[in-house]
Amino acid sequence: MSDEKKKLTVLLSGASFASVDNGWFELGCEALRAKGINRAIGGEAIADVANRMSRGDLYSREELDEVDVFVIMQVHNRDVYAPNELKKDYHEYALPFTRGNYAAAFDYVIKKYISDCYQLQFDKGSKYYGVKGGKPAVILLCTHWHDARVVYNESIRKLSDKWGFPLVKFDEQIGFSKTVEHPETHRQTSTLFADDTECIDGVEYGWHPNRGKDCYIQNRM
């Protein structure tokens, strides 16, 4: 199906868990018959996304006009909620962002996207020109691909509740949990579906999931 015939356009921001060599996002877009715009870059953090947005190079004005859903999958195991560290006006944040405050960077990205959508009502070149409130801003958040990153997973749930955003709960729907070891390997099941491992609180877990559209975990996601 050509992009012109697809009714839904989805923009993804993320890092190594979301880059195109994974496949889950592209598979999801194919299933939805949606046009996917994958702007995930391995090694980036939410601070980098905020900086790209501040420069105006995460998406063009034309792309913003067409995007129906903005998906954020920045899943470093950090607190992304922390309400006491946030600014009411996103213009008050010092730029460029560093990686010292994940909650502030998330707050900037969310408020900046909502504001960009709102401003389209004043843009004569936009299909939302003259529409009260501009374009409805639809943001979709994601947990980590499994439940071991507790700090992030718990705080992204709070952020989702705060804003009323839908949340993709990979950690609840992936098919295994950190609470139970694999009965044969006596290790975390996530290690069977990962290319490498990471240690959290003294336990070894799967880190980067096996990549490629033919991989089980990418299809599960």
Q: What residues fall within each predicted segment?
A:
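Structural signal for conserved beta-strand scaffold positions within catalytic alpha/beta enzyme cores
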Residues: 38-40, 141, 169
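Conserved SGNH/GDSL esterase-like catalytic core that processes O-acyl groups on lipids
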Residues: 6-12, 17-104
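Catalytic His-Asp segment of secreted/periplasmic serine-dependent ester chemistry enzymes
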Residues: 144-221
